[in-house]
Regions:
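Phosphate/dinucleotide-binding and metal-coordinating scaffold of catalytic cores
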Residues: 465
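N-terminal secretory signal peptides that target proteins for export/translocation
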Residues: 1-8
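N-terminal acidic, proline/glycine-rich, low-complexity intrinsically disordered segments
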Residues: 2, 27-29
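C-terminal motif of bacterial Sec signal peptides marking the signal peptidase cleavage site
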Residues: 22-25
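Sec-dependent N-terminal signal peptides
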Residues: 9-17
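Formylglycine-dependent sulfatase
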Residues: 90-455, 460, 469-495
């Protein structure tokens, strides 16, 4: 694989808050087995094939999404000579990295997946997807803290101890920010986190992000804000009241910090949106005409939920437009969601009741991811290879220092997928959660076709995700070999 970071260097990953590649579509009705790296050709379940070049455009027309109003929408692969090693782990240039995380936005609430007829209008993220890659099979964890800890460390919950909410990152953990500063090849990187942190156990240490290697922190340390218009911001250990709309304030802080940088940087932008409390956004973002009364919110919660996603999409566009051309051309943006959609706002036409945030079902762990920009030579395509949130640590390490530091994390570097089809070296995905007895604590493993769940009460189930995307029929008794294979992988991850 060859990467180039010459002229157009903006790379975007969509993980449910701002630019990230959209997640796996196990809910597809296609009954054909899709191998890792293959392009999904039936995106809407109507049985008609869609070519790589048609997929995202078709989705945009179906959902009524308009083009983003950004200064330079061309965020596809760079022009100019190709650079870097053929294995994709040693780019000659050091790109800036913007990782955007949305809070509680599952794939049923992501326009890039078309699992629902009730979707947000996200032209900025849609543009990134058209000029990059939408990932179909990405696993986070069932909750906020557990996914964030996995992203930060590249380790699964069983190996960090962060298995529930609120998570408390062990003091000996090495975060990706700490790795960048400690590694000689990437020690010139400046790092910042804006927004939700949620891995300090609620202990009240105002310097917690900085203690874990974050150079600059501006956000909310308390797990969830109670008012998007009146909240407490912590800036490098100092608290103060903030009455600027939360989504806007985070982008304001990110813009100011990025504008000051003279060295390559890694910025982590973790929106609270669209997490509750649901509310009407400021008038300039309120395109749905929401009244904001409690009665209206109670009656139309998903409308308010989707409005928050649309607002963060607009503000993401403002952030991108704020960058001078040289900075933007050398910036990789990743956008991803942290977990599935909560029950109160879940589209039950996409996932069954109970298959939401907090569960080990696909509706709880599959997240959206979009990648676009520098070094991404595949554009307007859907990648079916398996990706885990623990894979971001080695991938970012490879982008910034030329090494994925194999051995210090549970992840796999998926940088090669940016320019080559079918090169994600992952056979299985793993996730775990101990935070919700009602929905079932335990751990899960999936392959390209099957999913195994081991609940803490000793129950084991197996689902065929191709023929049973709703995960309703347990086929464990007739597929003992597959059960053993997936169970063994999970036990290996767990050190059992």
């Amino acid at each position: 694989m060859v990467l180039s970071f010459t002229r157009q260097r903006c790379l975007f990953f969509f993980i449910a808050p701002v630019l990230l590649v959209a997640l796996s579509s196990c809910g597809s009705s296609s009954e054909d087995e899709a191998s890792p790296g293959s392009v999904i050709t039936d995106t809407d379940g109507d049985g008609e094939e869609v070519s790589e070049s048609e997929t995202t455009d078709q989705e945009s027309s179906e959902t009524g999404v308009t083009e983003p109003e950004i200064t330079d929408p061309e965020v596809a692969g760079p022009d100019g000579d190709e650079q870097g090693d053929t294995d994709g782990t040693n780019p000659l240039d050091q790109p800036n990295i913007l990782l955007v995380i949305t809070d509680d936005q599952g794939i049923d609430a992501s326009a890039q997946y078309s699992l629902s007829n009730d979707l947000p209008n996200t032209p900025v993220i849609n543009s990134l997807a058209r000029n990059g890659i939408t990932y179909e099979n990405v696993w986070g964890t069932p909750s906020c803290s557990t996914t964030r800890a996995a992203l930060l460390t590249g380790m699964h919950g069983v190996n960090t101890g962060v298995l529930s909410v609120p998570g408390n990152l062990p003091t000996d953990s090495t975060t990706i920010q700490a790795f960048l500063s400690q590694n000689a090849a990437s020690s010139n990187y400046q790092t910042a986190v804006f927004g939700k942190w949620h891995v300090d156990g609620g202990g009240g240490n105002l310097n917690h992000p900085n203690d874990f290697g974050v150079g600059h922190y501006a956000g909310h340390l308390r797990p969830n804000i109670t008012d998007y218009f009146d909240w407490t911001i912590t800036i490098n250990g100092v608290e103060e009241r903030n009455t600027t709309y939360h989504t806007t304030a985070l982008v304001d802080n990110a813009i100011d910090w990025i504008d000051e940088q003279q060295s390559p940087w890694f910025a982590w932008l973790a929106f609270a949106a669209p997490h509750a409390p649901f509310h009407a956004p400021p008038d300039e973002f309120n395109t749905r005409g929401l009244s904001g009364t409690q009665a209206d919110i109670n009656a139309n919660e998903r409308e308010y939920f989707l409005s928050a996603i649309e607002t963060l999409d607009t503000e993401l566009g403002r952030l991108l437009n704020s960058m001078d051309p040289a900075t933007r051309d050398n910036t990789i943006v990743m956008v991803i969601g942290d977990n599935g959609t909560p029950r109160d706002v879940l589209d039950n036409d996409s996932f069954l009741d109970g298959h939401q945030k907090g569960s080990l079902f696909e509706g709880g762990v599959r997240v959206p991811l979009v990648i676009s920009g520098a070094g991404v030579t595949r554009t307007n395509v859907r990648e079916n290879g398996l990706v885990s949130v623990v894979d971001f640590f080695p991938t970012i390490a490879a982008l910034t220092s030329g090494t994925d530091n194999e051995g210090m994390h549970d992840g796999i570097n998926f940088l090669s997928s940016f320019s080559a089809d079918g090169e994600i070296d992952r056979e299985f995905l793993y996730t775990d959660y101990d935070g919700n007895n009602a929905l079932g604590q335990g751990w899960a493993v999936r392959s390209t076709t099957h999913k195994y769940i081991a609940y803490d009460n000793g129950t084991e189930v197996l689902y065929h995700l191709v023929t049973d995307p709703d995960e309703t029929v347990d086929v464990s008794t007739t597929n003992s070999a597959i059960v053993s294979e997936l169970r063994d992988f999970g036990l290996e991850v767990r050190g059992e």
